[in-house]
């Protein structure tokens, strides 16, 4: 809002949120007193009316084995792609695992496209994280999506199960690569006792790009914010200072 008032942000791009669609879905959030986990299964609480209508049937969701010893504080059930899939998020406290590092050793990161992350230390070491695999996945997704959308439009449909399956697979593959990239960078810092990570960032760097239609498409669709948030989370876990420097 401050940028809108100062004229630095286009006022046409700022609007009030839309109302939820008539048959739209919303996330179900279970707090501590509503979480019931027995025998590695989460039982979703239901109303009496629902239980009568479905003959007492209960929805039970398997809990990952790695969460057995964790104290789960919140569970979020998020509908995806119009309720075709559901994403389950378990929120729990992660015990810190501080490692021996030197605050004088710094790793600078420049995020990009072909070079997903260009990393250099103040001790003279440098390395690149390849981003071409992400571009390839995104290019294939755009090509397939355009074809499936044209078929769906001829049939009077906005989306189809095949489109949702395609998007789900693409998102999983992208997130997997970004997580592994963040893990590699943090492991490098641990091995070299680097105590500070400085990541270049510009809040509005994706707005008004003029790098060509194809490059703009790749750059805006690849979630660099997910990579930054994963890096920040891992740094907090291992006691590494994470900073973002405006470019």
Predicted segments, located by residue:
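Positively charged, helix-rich recognition surfaces that bind polyanionic ligands
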Residues: 84-247
